[in-house]
UniProtKB/Swiss-Prot annotation:
Pfam families to which the protein is assigned, alphabetical: iPGM_N, Metalloenzyme
An example Gene Ontology CC term for this record: cytosol
Positions of substrate binding: 123, 152-153, 184, 190, 257-260, 331
EC number: 5.4.2.12
CDD domains cross-referenced by the UniProt entry: iPGM
Enzyme class, first EC level, given as a word: isomerase
Name this polypeptide is given: 2,3-bisphosphoglycerate-independent phosphoglycerate mutase
Lineage: Bacteria, Pseudomonadati, Thermodesulfobacteriota, Desulfovibrionia, Desulfovibrionales
Binding of Mn(2+) 2, residues: 12, 62, 440-441
Reactions accelerated catalytically: (2R)-2-phosphoglycerate = (2R)-3-phosphoglycerate
Subunit field text: Monomer.
Cofactor: Mn(2+)
Length: 510
């Protein structure tokens, strides 16, 4: 073990992209960062899409970025986790799903699938629903679908194409029928507006609502009368309540995001529920949810929360070394909670420094330097104490000012950051330590869209990874990802990489 002190500096929202009028990173005068980017040995790493556990083409973000960096592996987000389980057929043998099928068969009941009909990828995805329908069909399960129309994470009338798709799928595969449908305004409230949930409940359980024969035509008629997806009033298929949730039936909620599914689930399972008068409450043979909605529910979950162990922070602590996490308020949770794999408690030997972000401005383009000077001052004091083997620091400016869409202010932010980067690099070299410069995702390098309009969102661009040890750049391999940083740090120390840390060591022997 050769534990040289390492300072990991994360420039939040600093991606790499070609020169353009919207690339504030190229427009700014940043001699220190530019010099490091030009060094031989540095590399670009992926910070978006599947490389960080998100769906292909999805931009990275600070939470996911720090989670991957700290975990030293690809941490699949819920949607991608389910996608992967479908691709490798793990969903087909999911024990909770199979147990639900068993309960349905033993009770001679039906399985009701409830969730958002959408490809928005925020609460659900239609491909997850279609996979569930296919698997249920293979097990000869009678399925009744109660879709909720989106209109928030998709266009206000995009629901028609999703309804056509799912009707076509149900028809071609003979995998089920639609029992009712309504807008998410009713079925997915999260503010205890129980009068909305009651309308969805009454349609799903009691068959109360506007009765229709054709879901596609009914949706078209709703549009014609001024309703849009989010606000589609509950419709019940057919003239009776035969396809409503009955005794001995089972229910599966297929949303993977919890917050807007909890209220309707609670109406099904809580004996002391008092949100509204439920009327007849069906005695279910089983109920399950795609992910953990609430620990208090105590019901089966197809994809439980992953317990991320052997993170970089945990390994450093187990080695008996001291570590420091430091950031200003806007990014403090990222270098602590997310970097530690979703752990709030400090590790033994871990210290934290929180620097207050400016409160005297409404938006950070009015103060683009934010608190970077104080963060740097306190960081250098800690570094020069020679107390810590690992310091993790986040500089928030590129991301937070980039989000304002103000290119001029973003240039000022980057120039303030560059000054601090130069100071930090010099201090690390003086202590013969290792300085690692990277970012969690892109933003400030792509501030205009293709039409020249302001773009305030993150990007899918790669980010830099530069390691300078004792004043000299280390040679790093290409085609890495954020999850490779932690294994690389352990390799610099010549420490064995735990099996849980499945990222790659990017140190090159060349």
């Amino acid at each position: 073990m050769n534990v040289v002190p390492i300072l990991l500096l994360i420039l939040d929202g600093y991606g790499l992209a070609p020169d353009s009028t919207g690339n504030a990173a190229k427009l700014a005068f940043t001699p220190n960062i530019d010099r490091m980017l030009a060094m031989s040995g540095g590399t670009q790493i992926h910070a978006s899409g599947r490389a960080v556990g998100l769906p292909d083409g999805y931009m990275g973000n600070s939470e996911v970025g720090h989670l991957n960096i700290g975990a030293g592996r690809v941490v699949y987000q819920q949607m991608t986790r389910i996608d992967v389980a479908i691709e490798n057929k793990e969903l087909d043998s999911n024990p909770i799903l199979l147990d639900l099928f068993t309960k349905v068969k033993s009770s001679n009941g039906r399985l009701h699938l409830l969730g958002l009909l959408s490809n928005g990828g925020v609460h659900s995805h239609i491909r997850h629903l279609e996979a569930l329908l296919s698997i249920a069909k293979e097990h000869n399960i009678q399925v009744i679908l109660h879709p909720f129309m989106d209109g928030r994470d998709t266009g206000p009338k995009d629901g028609l194409k999703f309804m056509k798709e799912i009707v076509s799928f149900l028809t071609s595969t003979s995998s089920g029928v639609i029992g009712s449908f309504c807008g998410r305004f009713y079925a997915m409230d999260r503010d205890k507006r129980w009068e909305r949930i009651k309308l969805a409940w009454d349609a799903i359980v009691h068959g109360v609502g506007l009765h229709v024969e054709d879901s596609v035509k009914a949706l078209e008629q709703a549009y014609a009368s001024g309703e849009t997806d989010e606000f589609i009033k509950p419709r019940v298929m057919g003239n009776s309540s035969v396809n409503c949730v009955q005794d001995n039936d089972a229910v599966l909620f297929f949303n993977f995001r919890a917050d807007r599914a909890r209220e309707l689930v609670s109406a099904f399972i809580l004996p002391d529920f008092n949100g509204f008068d439920r009327g007849r409450v069906p005695h279910l043979s089983g109920i399950a949810t795609m992910t953990m909605y609430d620990k208090e529910f105590n019901i089966p979950v197809l994809f439980n929360h992953e317990n991320i162990t052997k993170t970089l922070g945990e390994v450093v602590s187990a080695l008996g070394l001291l570590q420091l996490r430091i950031a200003e308020t806007e990014k403090y949770a990222h270098v602590t909670y997310f970097f530690s794999g979703g752990r709030e408690e400090v590790f033994t030997g871990e210290e934290r420094i929180l620097v207050q972000s400016p409160r005297d401005v409404a938006t950070y383009d009015l103060k683009p330097e934010m608190s970077v000077m104080e963060v740097t001052d306190r960081l250098l004091t800690a570094w020069n104490s020679k107390k810590f083997s690992l310091i993790v620091c986040n500089l928030a400016n590129p991301d937070m000012v980039g989000h304002t869409g103000n290119i001029k202010a973003s240039i000022s932010a980057l120039e303030a950051v560059d000054n601090c980067v130069g100071r930090i690099e010099k201090a690390v070299a003086e202590q013969h330590g290792c300085f690692i410069l990277t970012a969690d995702h892109g933003n400030v390098e792509e501030m205009l869209d293709k039409s020249g309009q302001p773009q305030t969102a993150h990007s899918c661009n790669p980010v830099p990874l530069i390691a300078i040890y004792d004043g000299k750049p280390l040679n790093l391999k290409e085609s890495g990802k954020l999850g490779d940083i932690a294994p690389t740090i352990l390799s610099i120390w010549d420490v064995s990489i735990p099996n849980e840390m499945t990222g790659n060591n990017l140190l090159s022997s060349e």
